[in-house]
Every structure is written in C-alpha cells, then in structure tokens.
Regions:
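Gly/Lys-enriched N-terminal cap/neck module of very large, oligomeric protein machines
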Residues: 141-173
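Catalytic phosphate-handling regions of large nucleic-acid enzymes and associated NTPases
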Residues: 1-137
C-alpha cells in the first residue's frame, strides 16, 4: 500500500536497490541463521524473519491479522532503538556484576525510545497512549497532521498540510 491508497505490490514489484543498512539485514542468511518458509505461491523459499543485526521489528514495525489475534506495532527511530538496546544491555551486565541492581524499567527505556516515529510525520497528541503501549502492549496513539496557513499573492489564504498521520490516504482528505 501507499499514501496514495495503492494496493500491496505483487512479487514482480519487489526488486530493490539495497542500502548498506539493508545489506546488514541479509548478512549470514545463507548460514541457516533463520528458518525458511515457502513464499505465497510455493515457488521459492523465503526467510521467516531477517537475520538482522539490529532490532528491525521495532524500527520497521509490524501489522498483521490472524485467527483470533492481531498486531499493529508502529515504527521507531533507529538511533533511539539502538540507544535503548545499549541501555538494556548495560543494565543486564550491571545485574550480572551486582545482583542488587534492579532490572531496567519501561520508564528508563522510554528515556531513549521516546515514542513511535511514523514515516509520514505528524504530531503525537498526548503521551499516555504511548506509555500504555510500552507498559502493557496495548495503547491508543493519536496523531495529528501538521499544517500551515499560507497567504497567496491574491490575498486568499489556504491551508497546506505538510505532514499526514500515518495510514491516512491523501485522496480520502
């Protein structure tokens, strides 16, 4: 899908030029580091997950529906996620060295991973939904558009929307 409401791409549209970071996501894939499964038409094998060297699931998010369950995990900023992972590992090492050290809390992780980072921008309205999502796995995050009022040469004003909430299709506006 896309911001224009296009449907998901078929296999013939999935060719891409990889960035260095994307190449890291595929490193060691031939070494049986992850399970493989048949693709949509059983013609090829594909990885169940990518053998990524960073927490790609948090960075790219996930969305899906299955029988009796669903998930909708938003995208996050790569730098913030790495900082959160470093804090988590440092805490784990400190706990091994000193068993009296408390496990890192969600609030402490949120000092590094502040909130989801949506690709189309927008402003998160309120913070309680983010906190709820991180603490319980369930939360409601409301995103507002970012807009400006511009004055045209003829004196008329117009509203220019610069950032849309994630998931909003332009043509539906």
């Amino acid at each position: 899908g896309s911001i224009d409401g296009d449907g998901a791409a078929a296999m013939r549209y999935t060719e891409a030029r990889l960035s260095k970071l994307a190449e890291e996501m595929l490193r060691d894939i031939e070494k049986d580091t992850v399970d493989m499964q048949l693709n949509f038409d059983d013609s090829l094998k594909e990885p169940v997950v990518l053998p990524c060297r960073f927490p790609n699931l948090l960075v790219n998010g996930a969305s899906g529906i299955a029988v009796g369950m669903a998930t909708n995990m938003p995208t996050h900023n790569l730098g913030e996620v790495i900082d959160g992972c470093v804090a988590y590992v440092k805490n784990a090492v400190a706990r091994v060295e000193n068993p009296e050290v408390e496990p890192i809390t969600v609030a402490e992780l949120m000092e590094h991973i502040k909130a989801p980072d949506f690709p189309t921008g927008g402003t998160i309205y309120g913070y309680q939904g983010v906190r709820d999502a991180y603490e319980t796995g369930r939360g409601r995050i409301i995103i507002r558009s970012k807009a400006e009022i511009e004055t045209e040469d003829n004196g008329r004003e117009r509203i220019v929307i610069g950032e849309l909430p994630y998931g909003v299709v332009k043509s539906d506006l």
